[in-house]
Structure formats: structure tokens, C-alpha cells
A protein has these predicted regions:
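N-terminal secretory signal peptides that target proteins for export/translocation
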Residues: 1-11
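Bacterial N-terminal signal peptides
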Residues: 13-26
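C-terminal region of N-terminal signal peptides and the immediate post-cleavage residues
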Residues: 27-31
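Flexible, surface-exposed loop/linker segments and immediately adjacent secondary-structure boundaries
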Residues: 32-155
Length: 155
């Protein structure tokens, strides 16, 4: 029996749609963004600004690349990144986590400090490789390979 082309096109289209849907379902979790770290301590007012929404920070809440963290006049927050480095934010602080990557045993982190105080405790990457850690302010850049230091910026 001879079938017309439109029948085969419809069957092929349905199969293609089914395969595409299956690929999305299977790969969806792999495409989801993994948090760069999480809050381990929060006191006072601490908020995360993420993709146009504002989220109240609390212990255990994840921090993603591109998140802006803002503390109130009474706010303090401690974030532990996935490489075990710590970011400690003081009152009236405003930072953005611009970059956090772990690739082949090396870590690269970039934080923008818009205002306030940030204490950084930077760990060496796994295997003892130095971490590439930068704090950018509106008029300076601090770049370290594994140490602890404070950065403050006021307008």
C-alpha cells in the first residue's frame, strides 16, 4: 500500500517532538543552575536580589552567580562558597557575586563590593592550587590567591 508524503511527515514530526521532549526532561536537572554557596549565618536584615525578585536570606539559602546581597543597617551575613571560602558581610553592605567557577582543581571568584564591608577568607583550590579571588570596588581591585582580608568602600 502506498502512503502519501503528508502521512510520513506527520509521523516524523510527532516522533521528533517526542524525542525533543524526552531530551528536555532528561537533561533539565543538568541544565539547572547550581548554587555557588549558601548562607551559614544571618542576623538582622539581609536580602538577596535575584532575577528581579527579592528574597530574604536565611541560613541554608543558596547564593547563585549574579545574585546581589544587601544587608541593612543591622544586617550581617556569612556565605560559604563551594570551595569553602567565606564571605562575611557587615552592616549596610551591598555585593554582587559576579563569578564563581571550579574547573580542573582551580577556583575563580569575582565579587563586586558596591558599598559597606566585606571580609574574605579565601581557601586554596583543591590539590593546593591557588585560588583566583578578586574583589572589585568602584575605584580599585584586590586580587589574592588564598588569604584573609577585609575590604571596605563608602561613597
Amino acid at each position: 500500500m502506498r502512503r502519501n508524503r503528508s502521512h510520513y511527515s506527520a509521523v516524523f514530526g510527532a516522533e521528533l517532538l517526542l524525542i525533543s521532549a524526552l531530551v528536555l526532561v532528561v537533561s533539565g536537572p543538568a541544565l539547572a543552575q547550581t548554587a555557588a554557596g549558601s548562607f551559614v549565618s544571618v542576623s538582622g536584615q539581609v536580602q538577596i536580589q535575584r532575577a528581579g525578585a527579592t528574597i530574604g536570606a536565611a541560613s541554608g539559602v543558596g547564593v547563585d552567580v549574579a545574585d546581589r546581597i544587601v544587608t541593612g543597617a543591622d544586617g550581617h551575613g556569612v556565605i560559604v562558597l563551594n570551595d569553602r571560602s567565606r564571605l562575611e558581610l557587615g552592616p549596610a553592605s551591598n555585593i554582587t557575586l559576579d563569578e564563581f567557577t571550579i574547573t580542573g582543581g582551580s577556583t575563580s571568584t569575582r565579587v563586586s563590593l558596591v558599598s559597606g564591608v566585606l571580609r574574605s577568607l579565601v581557601n586554596a583550590a583543591s590539590g593546593g592550587a591557588p585560588a583566583n579571588y578578586q574583589v572589585h570596588t568602584p575605584n580599585a581591585v584586590a586580587s589574592v590567591r588564598g588569604t584573609r582580608f577585609d575590604t571596605a568602600y563608602t561613597e
